[in-house]
From Swiss-Prot:
Gene: secA
Purpose of the protein: Part of the Sec protein translocase complex. Interacts with the SecYEG preprotein conducting channel. Has a central role in coupling the hydrolysis of ATP to the transfer of proteins into and across the cell membrane, serving both as a receptor for the preprotein-SecB complex and as an ATP-driven molecular motor driving the stepwise translocation of polypeptide chains across the membrane.
Positions contributing to ATP binding: 89, 107-111, 502
Catalytic activity: ATP + H2O + cellular proteinSide 1 = ADP + phosphate + cellular proteinSide 2
Membrane topology of the entry: Peripheral membrane protein
GO cellular component: cell envelope Sec protein transport complex; cytosol; plasma membrane
Name this protein carries in UniProt: Protein translocase subunit SecA
Species assigned in the record: Sinorhizobium medicae (strain WSM419)
Length: 903
């Protein structure tokens, strides 16, 4: 029976269908201009860019020129790349321009679609960012699509790892900039650690189109990008605690795989306390006494390292290092590290060198970074399942773009076996069958361990020609994926490895030409061989089509339906036939964690024998319900964490905006004076209670405060003893003395030097206090959840206390800046040999898995002093060479920075 809603959808179409139909008028208008555009010369077509810019300057909006601009890009793409955007691609481009997410199936040309709104919005002259998930895709897309922009008179830049500040600044200054999400976020953080506006590389956040938007804005949504500096070495402590865990019994701890948590039982805690006591690490009687907070953190990490993290699934050991495996893609991520000491615990477990921990200097999540853009849009093949999250958090609507040709892929019901062994036996038989008929196969696994297990099983069964695509071999992944459509090819891939590269039936002729003819010079021979390769690929394509197209066989379901849909979507591109099927067992992670006992009982009642499978739509629906529960839980976690992160984000925006104002201001003297006056107000109010008699005033305390903050030795005790003295009199005398001392110092220094000194001191002190503030908020966040036991809302408590900490930061800033500036004196030092400083590191932590992704900051502007030197406190610097980089972190030589004065 058809529901009323279903009947209405059939009669009127879905809301998505109606929205898509609404673009038809503009598509027709673009098509109507096609002949006119074709008639233009190359020069006349390129001149349209200047014409559009003049129209915008005269008051036209981007919407007003959308139709002719899209028509120009379509014609340019045809001339430059030989690609003409289809009508559905024009619709995708309009969706992106209108701040929405375009869901486009694999092979529908998302990269080309982006050129339409990118060109249109770049006409505004504010820069457009196209965001990809890795350097390879950023360079590939910028190289290919940049030809269109260049033909039309626009510049294209690309940001990848390892560029200098100057190269980054040039790339951001281009009309169009291709970059990875990591590089964009790190550049933003680095910019807000610079001490001069001219050192910054980004020029604003106008419009960003995020490719694979679900991966970046959902999978890594709450991933903090972190820039940090090293802390003291604690490797001995990690190694000592690591030895305790193997001495525990299973009843000494509780493991919850669903929540990814591990806790000690009462017996386990008692055993652990005895071990710690013997090692001299326990203070007091109980592990959970306040003085043992750090030790609790270490033992919990050690327990997780041994019981929650599995080698070759969560990480591998390579060249004496722990290398993280991405949960979603199965890729190795060199440089990514687990946070909060977890990585060090794993290093201790695997007996490799323990790298030092780091202190956070600056951080931001992708959620908050991308919400800074005036205009945001995204593309992906799978977004509909996360439409609620995109709408609630980013204000982005998800619209499905129709395929250019109907999808012919057949998605079969899952086959469920009782054990993993039975499942893999059936998979081997299915691979044999498909291989014999010449059907190309993509076999999806969820981990390196399982991909290599399957590879070993295939070898034992006599298979020699197959490709394994996982984290260990990611360097070759683009080529392997591109050739996975060759008849009879067997490609084993972890999750979405190779995402961004299409699997073309018969293989990818362009990649074959690039690889096979790399040494052949242009000419008749190369043209002949290129033609032969293309003809061979066409023959192979016909064979693959005859065999049924690409067969996607998945060996397990992921927690997210979206990841499963991504895998299915590799087959059936551009109207090709295809097939997809999932092989499952009750021992799979998803089935085991989310209640396979009931299903196992049901299968036994049905009399299911060994090696037999059950195939029924009910199974698919039950699994989908389990996945929906996981997705809803993960969404709630992300949504809740965002509420907490918004508190830090609001404060971060205030601090970063204040830094820019300080760098832009011609003079900060008024700011310094205001700070000094507020400090005077605070110390007077503290020592002279309101409406109190003079004998109740704390004259000695006030004298000490004035000495501490203003570096002035004033006869305050004598002033207080004067007949009829008032509080205002005391305040005015202190203010006058402080103003005079500041004026005398400014006269000695000269206005130019004084301006530089004042600005430098404020920025350095602000940065130092902000770093401490981040640590304080982290500590507050880690314990605030316990307020719920007292019937108090943890979020409201966090907001309230975070605000108090922020107010304290501002108060400390006023006091520290005032105290330092009132002590500044000019000095001259003899030159010494320069000493190099250790670089800072950039980190990328994934809260879903606890991963910490870092890369060397890569420029001297980000050098930090050794831990014995406090950048905000010159008294800790000791002897500094004139030619050494200044310990304050400005990036200048000491003789051009703090070398002109001394605190």
């Amino acid at each position: 029976m058809v529901s009323l809603g279903g009947f209405a959808r059939k009669l009127f179409g879905s809301a998505n269908d109606r929205r898509v139909r609404g673009y038809k008028g503009r598509v027709d208008a673009i098509n109507a201009l096609e002949a006119e555009m074709k008639a233009l010369s190359d020069e006349a077509l390129a001149a349209k860019t200047a014409e559009f810019r003049r129209e915008i300057a005269d008051g036209k909006s981007l919407d007003d020129i959308l139709v002719p601009a899209f028509a120009v890009v379509r014609e340019a793409a045809r001339r430059v790349l030989g690609l003409r955007p289809f009508d559905v691609q024009l619709i995708g481009g309009m969706i992106l321009h209108e701040r929405a997410i375009a869901e486009m199936k694999t092979g529908e040309g998302k990269t080309l679609v982006a050129t339409l709104p990118v060109y249109l919005n770049a006409l505004a002259g504010k820069g457009v960012h196209v965001v990809t998930v890795n350097d390879y895709l950023a360079q590939r897309d910028a190289g290919m699509m940049g030809r269109i922009y260049g033909f039309l008179g626009m510049s294209t830049g690309v940001i990848v790892h390892g560029l200098s500040d100057e190269q980054r600044r040039d790339a951001y200054a281009c009309d169009v900039t291709y970059a990875t999400n990591n590089e964009l976020g790190f550049d933003y953080l680095r910019d807000n650690m610079k001490y001069e506006r001219s050192q910054m590389v980004q020029r604003g956040h106008f419009f960003a189109i995020v490719d694979e938007v679900d991966s970046i804005l959902v999978d890594e949504a709450r991933t903090p990008l972190i820039i940090s500096g090293p802390l003291d070495d604690r490797s001995d402590l990690y190694n000592t605690i690591n030895e305790f865990i193997p001495r525990l019994s299973p009843e000494d701890y509780e493991i919850d795989e669903k929540q990814r948590s591990a806790n000690f039982s009462e017996d386990g805690t008692e055993k652990l306390e005895n071990m710690l006591r013997e090692a001299g690490l326990l203070k007091g009687e109980s592990l959970y006494d306040i003085e043992n907070v750090a030790i609790v953190h270490h033992v919990n990490n050690a327990l997780k390292a041994h019981k929650l993290f599995t080698r070759d699934k969560d990480y591998i050991v390579r060249n004496g290092e722990i290398v993280i495996i991405d949960e979603f893609t199965g890729r190795m991520m060199p440089g990514r590290r687990y946070s909060e000491g977890q990585h060090q615990a794993l290093e201790a477990k695997e007996k490799v060198q323990i790298q030092p921990e780091n202190q956070t200097l600056a951080s931001i999540t992708f959620q908050n970074y991308f919400r800074m853009y005036d205009k945001l849009a995204g593309m992906t093949g799978t977004a509909a399942t996360e439409a609620e999250e995109f709408g609630n958090i980013y204000g982005l609507e998800v619209l499905e773009v129709p395929t250019n040709l109907p999808i012919k892929r057949i998605d079969e019901d899952d086959e469920v076996y009782r054990t993993v062994g039975e499942k893999f036996k059936a998979i081997i038989e299915e691979i044999k069958s498909a291989h014999e008929r010449g059907q190309p196969m993509l076999v999806g696994t969820t981990s390196i361990e399982k991909s290599e297990l399957l590879a070993e099983m295939l070898k034992k069964d006599g298979f020699s020609k197959f490709q394994v695509l996982n984290a260990r071999y990611h360097e070759q992944e683009a080529f392997i994926v591109a050739q996975a459509g060759v008849p009879g090819a067997i490609t084993i891939a972890t999750n979405m490895a190779g995402r961004g590269t299409d699997i073309q039936l018969g293989g990818n002729p362009d990649m074959r030409i690039q690889q096979e003819l790399s040494d052949v010079e242009p000419g008749a021979e190369r043209e002949s061989r290129e033609k032969a390769i293309r003809e061979e690929v066409q023959v192979l394509k016909e064979k693959a089509l005859a065999a049924g197209g690409l067969y996607v066989l998945a060996t397990e379901r992921h927690e997210s339906r979206r990841i499963d849909n991504q895998l299915r979507g590799r087959s059936g591109r551009q109207g090709d036939p295809g097939r997809s099927k999932f092989y499952l067992s009750l021992q799979d992670d998803l089935m085991r964690i989310f209640g396979s006992d009931r299903m196992d009982g049901m299968l036994q009642k049905l009399g299911l024998k060994e090696g037999e499978a059950i195939v029924h739509p009910w199974i698919n629906k039950a699994l989908e319900r389990a996945q929906k529960k996981v997705e809803a839980r993960n969404f709630d976690i992300r949504k809740n964490l965002l509420k907490y992160d918004d508190v830090l984000n609001d404060q971060r925006k205030v601090i970063f905006e204040q830094r820019i104002e300080l760098m832009d201001a011609e003079s900060v003297t008024d700011t310094v004076t205001d700070m000094r006056n507020e400090v005077i107000e605070e110390v007077v109010a503290k020592r002279i209670p309101e409406r109190a008699y003079a004998e109740k005033w704390d004259a000695e305390g006030l004298k000490a405060d004035v000495q501490q903050y203003l570096n002035l030795d004033l006869p305050i005790v004598e002033w207080v003893a004067e007949e009829g003295i008032a509080e205002d009199d005391i305040r005015e005398r202190i203010t006058a003395a402080a103003d005079q001392a500041a004026a005398d110092r400014a006269e000695r220094f000269g206005p130019e030097v004084m301006q530089y000194v004042e600005r430098s001191v404020i920025l350095q002190t602000l940065d130092h206090l902000w770093r401490e503030h981040i640590v304080n908020l982290d500590h507050l966040r880690s314990v605030i959840g316990f307020r719920g036991y007292a019937q108090r809302d943890p979020l409201q408590e966090y907001k309230s206390e975070a605000f108090e900490l922020f107010q304290a930061l501002l108060g400390n800033l006023r006091q520290a800046v005032t105290a330092q500036l009132m002590r500044v004196e000019l000095v001259r030092e003899a030159p010494e040999e320069p000493q190099p400083l250790p670089p800072m590191q950039a980190h990328h932590i994934d809260p879903l898995t606890g991963e910490d992704d870092f890369a060397p900051a890569g420029d001297t502007l980000l050098a930090v002093a050794p831990t014995t030197r406090d950048p905000a406190d010159p008294s800790t610097w000791g002897k500094v060479s004139r030619n050494e980089a200044c310990p304050c972190g400005s990036g200048k030589k000491y003789k051009h920075c703090h070398g002109v004065y001394e605190a």
